[in-house]
Each structure stands twice: as C-alpha cells, then as structure tokens.
Amino acid sequence: MGHQHLIMLFMLSSLFSLAAGIQSPTYWPHFSGDRIVTTLDGPSWDYTMNMDPHFDSMDPSFTPASVALDRKATVPSCSDLVHGGASGYLGPRGVAMYRRTFDHAAGAKIRLQFQSCSFYCKVWINGHLVGDHKAGGYVPFWLDVPAATMKAKDNEIFVLADNRFNATTAPMHTGGDFWHYGGLIRSVEVHSMPTTASGAVYPWRAWVMPSATNIHQPFRAPTAIDITLALMSSASSSPTTTVKFTLDFDGAGSPQKMSATPNANGTIILKNVPVPNPMLWSTTSPTMHTVTVTIDGASLSERFGLRHWGVKTDTDGASRLTINGEIVKLVGWNHHTQWPVTAASPTDAQMDADILLLKQGGANYVRGAHYPQDPRWLDRLDEAGIVMWSETLGPDVKLKNTQDFSKGGFMEYQMQQMQEMLDGAFNHASIMTCVEFFLLCVLHYSNDCDWCIREHHPDIES
C-alpha cells in the first residue's frame, strides 16, 4: 500500500472516531457511577491564531469576549497544522485561542483535566479565569472550577495556548532537536462532582506500587500492592474525616470494605494490600490487573502490572537487569510523537502501527523522546510488554537552568512537570525509568529528582 493511501486511512480513522461521538475517555484510568467524566474532544471548537508578536498572553486585562474566532478546529490537534503549517513538520509561532460550550449538572463542581496544552495555557469558564499552566506542553494537569462559576447549560470554555518560545510563559521549552508543537494536542476532560448527602468525596487517582520491592532482591515476585489514594471533593477544602470505600480487583464483583482518614494532603496510603490470584507482568507475558475504588457510588478503576525490577550478579561478575528475578536484555528504539498529517496528535491507528513496527523489529524497550507521553501510547506499551523510558521535556537544557531555584524559576516548574508526568505514568507497568530533562538530573541534581518523586509518591522505593 502506498504512502498516500496510508495517510488517507489514518485520516478516515480519525474522522470515524469523531463521527462516533465518543464522550468518555478510552484510555486508563476509567470512571463510572456518580463520577461523571466526559471529554470535550471533537470538531466543535471555534478557533483563531493570534500572530501579533507583541501580544501578551499574561496580560490581566485580556478577556475572551474581546476575541472573534474565525474558524473551526478539532481537539485534539496541533495548532501548527490548523493554521496551515506543513503537515507534521513546521508551523507558525503564535497564540492559539479555542472556544466551545458544554452542558453540566446544575450545582456540581467540576475539574478540568488537560492531557496536554502546549506551550503556555490559560483557561476561562464563562468569562472567569480559572487558572494557567507553565510547566510544559506535554504533561497532564488539572484545574478546579468552582460550582458558582457554572451554569446548567451552555457553559463556555475558552483556552489560550501560546506556542512561542519564551522563558517567562514557557520556561520548560528550551529547544532541542525536534519540533515543539502547540495547541490542545491531547484530550480535554470534564470531571463532574455533584454534591451528595455524605459530603461528596470522590476518588481522583489511585497510584499503585508493588509492595516491599527492593532492587537488590531480584527474585522477589510481588503479590500485594501499596496504594496512594488521592481524593477530590465538591467542597472547597480537601476531605479530612474518615472515608468509607471499597476495593474490587479485576472486576470480580467482590468488593472489600475499608475505611481510613486522609492525611493533610487529602490522600490515603494503604500498605500491603493483597491482590487476588496475582499474575506477573513481563515483556513476554504482559498480564494486567485492575483495582476499582468506589466511594459513595463514584468509582475509579486503575490498571496496573505486578512486576519487580532488580539487579543480580551473573556468573562472570557482571551486574544484570532482571524482571521478576529473570535476566532480561532490553533492545529498543527512540520514539518521537511526530507524524505526517497529524503531527503530535496521532490517531489510534497510527499508534497501533508504530507498536507493530516495534514488535516486528524485535524491540522490548522504547525511549519516549523528549517529553512525557500520551496516555494512549502508554496503554499500548503495557499491553505489548514493551518497557518505557519516560522523561520530562528536553533535551536542550543548560546547566544555568538547573541552577535556577528562584521563585518562578526553571527548577520550580521542572519539579512541577516531574510530578505531573509521574501522575500520568506511575501506574503503567511498562514504565521502568523516569528521567528529568534527558540525563541532567542524574548528572547534576539527582537528589532533587529523588526528593521530588518521594514528596509526591511517598510509597515509592529507590
């Protein structure tokens, strides 16, 4: 099949998905019950690109009402291409602006989850500024929207996405040997939190770590997990009273009743939770488990793999990497999210084709260069048994950047980006390595990287 025919198939696949009207996220984690989660993906966005080089994206006097959006855009997609750039390679530097409306349950608070908004992102709901994001254009982040800001119908979301290189608005985008795409390049989710009699506590995420793993004990096969359960509330403050919840593994329909009091950060840490009928994940047998957390009718389902990375000494005295006690040789490729036609917003078919190429090439290891990855890609790596190297945005980071710990400086946003990358990647069995801006954290500031990881995920072992 010729190159043009393949491109046409990819475009038709994307259009079919839009026509099907898929509203819930298809990637993990999954949500159900009273926790209503929909995406704002699709062709319903009004759009324009401001090409004025003097336009100030941080101007506090700017209002969405002052802008006329003169064309349509599909989300997710790259503003570089929407504005007429060469497919997959080049595009304009400017400020993309998006607007659409959505309905919402009356009286409910919402959380907006952006899987990516590149580079600098600023968001309004019904004309009210709800927040911005400077920590890089390839990481997921969320913004809470107060219930008082919302209406029952026709809520307007307005998003500004500035893809210009600028140390103030986009400190993480230092350049590099690839094209930095702009716009709403991945999905946008709306998480609805109706108020209930029990206080409207919802499970936000449940980060899973195999229990009692130690890299120096390579033969250990984990059968239990540690869970860091992050909570969200429709109230203005984090929940602090005892929370009753259930855990159900692999959709068995046998929920375990539990209760715990959240810490000051609104999280509950569970240690050594047994996994029924535990099966190990490996590169040759990528078996996955699920755990569903339910609080007052709102359910969150996370997918994870039981695996243990270790190091053991071979007969010749060399240290060898192991998974579940077995020596494994990793062979792989660097992988960029940069396709013709779709650029950094690939279709599912394009991702499937790349997984097939990796498998055909005998790869069991892939490096995600040079930025945090799309959740759909991480799901596919989990299922294919391909190990992943995940890194924050790089690689053109200078030593002076890593020495900037000032308020609002480079390292403040680098630590935020690392946390957000971990939030999105932590449960994926394929993830073996998390790296900060290429290799500089290992060479210069490994202690700061280690602190960042432990601060955000205290159950992790190093």
List PLM regions with ranges.
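Structural beta-strand segments of beta-rich domains
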Residues: 110, 221-229
